[in-house]
Amino acid sequence: MFDMDGVIIDSEPLWSKAEQQLLARRNLSYSPQLKAVMMGINSSEAVGFLIKHYNLQESVGDVVEERNQLMAGLFRQFLRPMPHALQLVRSVHAAEIKTGLASSSPKELVDLALGRLNITGLFDLILSGDQVARGKPAADIYLTAARELGVSHENCLVIEDAPHGVAAAKAAGMCCLAISTSTNESELGAADRVVRGFDEVDLALLQDVMRCSRDRG
C-alpha cells in the first residue's frame, strides 16, 4: 500500500504553499512548526488544528473547502511525481501484486492527482482520508484497505513518508517502508526500513522488508 503525498507525488511543498495562502488571507503567518504537526493527518483534523491554534471563528467545513480549492489549483499548475515513484508502482502492478493507495488527502484531491498522472488504473483500491472515521496515526485507513483488498494485515507492506503514517501502518500490524523525502530519517525510526528515495527501492527490497519484519515478529 502506498501513501500519496510525499510518496507518489511531490506535494508537501504545495501543501505548505496552500496553507501559507490560506493564512495570508487572514493576515496570519505560517511556520515550519505548523507543518510538522499537520503533516500526514487528514484535512478536517489539520484545519481543526489551525482553527484552534489561531482561534479562528470559522467552521471546519468552510476552511477545508477553501484549503482544498487552493490545493487543487496548485496541483493543476505544479503537480509532479516523486522521482522514481511511478516506476515502482508500475513494477508492483506488473507483478500482479494487490496494490492500494491510502491517503490522508480528501477524495477530490486524490482523484485529481492520480488522474493528472494517469495512474488511477494501477491501483486495485484507492482510499482517502474522508472515507474513514479516524485519520492517521489511527490504523483505520490501512485496516479498511486490507479488508477491502482481501489481504490479511500481516501480509501488507505500507510505504510512507511521515511519522503519522508510519504510526498508522504499525498500529495496523503491517510492515512499513519509510521514504525520508519529507521527514528526517530520525523521525521515521518506527518503520521496518528507511530509505532516502525510490531509486533505492525495487521488488526485491520490498520482499526483504517483509521478511525482516516477520523475522523480528
Could you tell me what each predicted segment is?
Residues L28, L56, I119:
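Hydrophobic patch in the ABC ATPase nucleotide-binding domain
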Residues I8, P81, T99-A102, R134, ...:
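Conserved SAM-binding loop
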Residues G40-G73, P83, R90-H93:
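A metal-dependent, Asp-based hydrolase signature
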Residues W15, S43, P81, A138:
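Conserved donor sugar-nucleotide recognition element shared by glycan-biosynthetic enzymes
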Residues G73-L101, K107, D111:
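Short, acidic loop-to-helix structural element flanking the phosphoryl-transfer center
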Residues M1-A36:
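Active-site neighborhood of HAD-like aspartate-dependent phosphohydrolases
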Residues R90-H93, P106-G217:
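Asp-based, Mg2+/Mn2+-dependent phosphohydrolase catalytic module
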